[in-house]
Each structure stands twice: as C-alpha cells, then as structure tokens.
C-alpha cells in the first residue's frame, strides 16, 4: 500500500467486524454473495475475518452454536473455491441489560471471550451502559464499542466515548465511515476520534458488495496519510492481538476540547 511515497506492508490484515455469513442478518443475502464478498476482502488485502452477525438487536438472534456452525460451513465453501481467507465466529452483540444472564450464549472476538463487540442503538446511549460494561468486565470481558462515530448521541458529545474508554472499554471505527462513505460529517467525527486516540481498531463492517463493501485498505491508507503509518500499523496490530486474545489497552487518549465560538460585532 502506498501512502505519500511511504510503502506500507501488512503480513496480514485482520478484519474484526464483518457481516459475511450468508442469510442470517442484514449482511450477505446468500452463499454466492458471501463468496463474492470473500473475494473482495482478499482483493482488499484481508487475510482473517471475524464474522459478526447481529445478535439481540430486536431484528436478529444468532445463537453462539449457530454462528459457530455457520462459520464452519462457510470455511468449507471457501476452501472448495480456493479463496485464501480464514473466518472466525463472533457476534455484534446489541446492548441489553440482561447480557450477563445471556453470557454463555455470547461469542467474543477471541476464543476466551476476553473481548466482545458491543453495539449501541444508533440514536442514543442507554443510561445503563456504564453499569453493563462494568458487569461484563467483572466477567472477564472487555467490550469493544462498535462504530461510535455513527451514534447520534455520541456525535453531539464525543467525550461520552472518552468516559467509556476511561472506564476500560475499547472502541472500533468503521473503515467506510473514515473513508467518507457515510458522508463528510461522519468522516470528520471519525478523524477526530482517531486523532484523540479514542478508538483502538478500524474494521470494515462490510455487509454487501454495493454500498458497504471492503474499504479497509483505503481507510488504513488515509489514516497513515493523516496521522502517520505507525497509527495504521497500530490499528492492525491491535486487531490481530484482539483476535488472539492478547492484551490491548487504550493509551494516550484525551478529551476533545470543544471549539469556542466568537461573535464579532
């Protein structure tokens, strides 16, 4: 990958958030589409994917055992098509007050459930979110708050995310957001979150070939241009470490100072 004359090379690219499994949520509608998504991922440089279908979001329920079986079946299809992509089972878990009671049915981002993708509603941040995150931490799981840049309440006050990071959570920005696929406003927020180190990983959140495809390498290239190749490499290293259940912590994060507005007479 070229970035302003700097050559960026990844031995592997790990995508921690992807709706590639066929026909189980609002992602890929069928197997053929999933295989085409897999080819697009490989073309984008992705080598490992955490398959993260929606779970408990009022539209979809994807139980742990069902996701594991779906991943096994899909991996067999990838092998038959000679697509060099390794897929792992996960979930995008929608925040619910009873997640600790459902814990046995939840999949982590890693085999030991040290990390878990946690989705907030798009419109708000539930009042019980801090308590729930603390309860998950007591169970040994660090929540990774997904696509905070698209949450309407966080958009109005980015320091809401700062508070969660300060209390031990991690956060993931979406590649499409950073690359401008959700508009300039979301792209600007994404940049601010990266600049202030309030996100620790970037992932595709790819759903379908048209509109929400793989732009992970494009986003990493832009991040390297904006903040240096070390930042892009750190994001990818974090993704690999999370998948392997190794230690990843937020560091260097800071509050975002609101810009003062001056009225001139």
Descriptions of predicted regions:
Residues 1-82:
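An N-terminally biased module of ancient metal coordination in phosphate/nucleic-acid-related enzymes
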Residues 17-21, 147, 207:
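Histidine-centered divalent metal-coordination motifs
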Residues 42, 137, 194-195:
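Non-catalytic positions within long, well-ordered alpha-helices that form the structural scaffold/packing
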Residues 56-59, 94-96, 150-154, 178-181, ...:
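Active-site environment of divalent metal-dependent phosphoester hydrolases
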Residues 59-67, 81-86, 211-238:
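Short acidic, glycine/proline-enriched helix-loop-strand junctions
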Residues 60-172, 250, 254-265:
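Extended substrate/RNA-proximal surfaces in nucleic-acid metabolism proteins
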Residues 198-214:
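Short acidic/histidine-rich active-site segments
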Residues 220-265:
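Mid-to-C-terminal alpha-helical segments outside catalytic/metal-binding sites
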